[in-house]
Each structure stands twice: as C-alpha cells, then as structure tokens.
Amino acid sequence: MAEVKEYKQLNGLALAYMGDAVYEKFIREYLLAAGKTKPNQLHKTATKFVSAKGQAVALKAMIAEGFLTEEEDRIAKRGRNAKSYTVPKNTDPGTYSMSTSFEAVLGYLYLAGEMERLQEWMEKALEIVEKGVETN
C-alpha cells in the first residue's frame, strides 16, 4: 500500500475522499458478517449508514457526547469548512457539510495509522445510526 506522507497537509475534501472509502468498506464487512447477503437488502441497509444523513447524525451525537479529541475536532472543522462545488440533490448543504466532516476525520485517522481510534469511531457511528434506525 502506498504511504501518504503529507496527509496532515491534505485539504478536508481529500481526507473525506479517503474516509468515505474506509467507512464504506467497514459497513460492507459489518453487513456481510451480520448475515445480510441479498443485494437489495445490502444496499438498503448500507445506505442508512453511509448516507450523508446517517453520517451527520452520527457526528452530531459524537460531538454532543464529547467523543472527539481536540485534533479530531480540528480535522472535523477542516472537513466541514471545505468548499465543495457539488451537493447531492437529495441532501441539504448543512447535512452534506457534516457528513464531509465525519468522513474527513475517518480519512485522517486512517492515513495517520491510528487504526484503534478509527475502529472506535466507526463502531460508535454504527451504534448511533443503529439506534436511530430502530426508533424510526
């Protein structure tokens, strides 16, 4: 695997790009391990976790709980303030910016090699989104 030496200098969108892939892989593995194997079922369930709304809900709850370190908070702000010139048509800009923020932190943790903390983040997000899914 190629090492990204200057990951601390990457902009929020580049970090989010990496974080998106890391989180998508985590969720797919989680769903397969949970015994979900039908393609339609996999897609519908995965979307609840990897959607901008799901990620924004998770990050807001994590911030409210004081889960973020100072460094993670700084990276989250960098992701949230990143200027994206496209916003998906089914997502409002605020939600999209929070999800970019969430993904930026995951990307940063991954590139920094902080795998234990990355795992904590993804498990916490999973727990938060699952609770939201159960109550809806």
From Swiss-Prot:
UniProt EC number: 3.1.26.-
GO molecular-function terms, A-Z: ribonuclease III activity; rRNA binding
Annotated localization: Cytoplasm
Coiled-coil regions listed in the entry: none
Cellular component annotations (GO), alphabetically ordered: cytoplasm
SMART domains: RIBOc
Cofactor(s) needed for function: Mg(2+)
A Pfam family assignment: Ribonuclease_3
Active site (record annotation): D20
Its biological purpose: Involved in correct processing of both the 5' and 3' ends of 23S rRNA precursor. Processes 30S rRNA precursor transcript even in absence of ribonuclease 3 (Rnc); Rnc processes 30S rRNA into smaller rRNA precursors.
Subunit structure: Homodimer.
Protein family per UniProt: Belongs to the MrnC RNase family.
Protein name, per record: Mini-ribonuclease 3
Gene that encodes the chain: mrnC
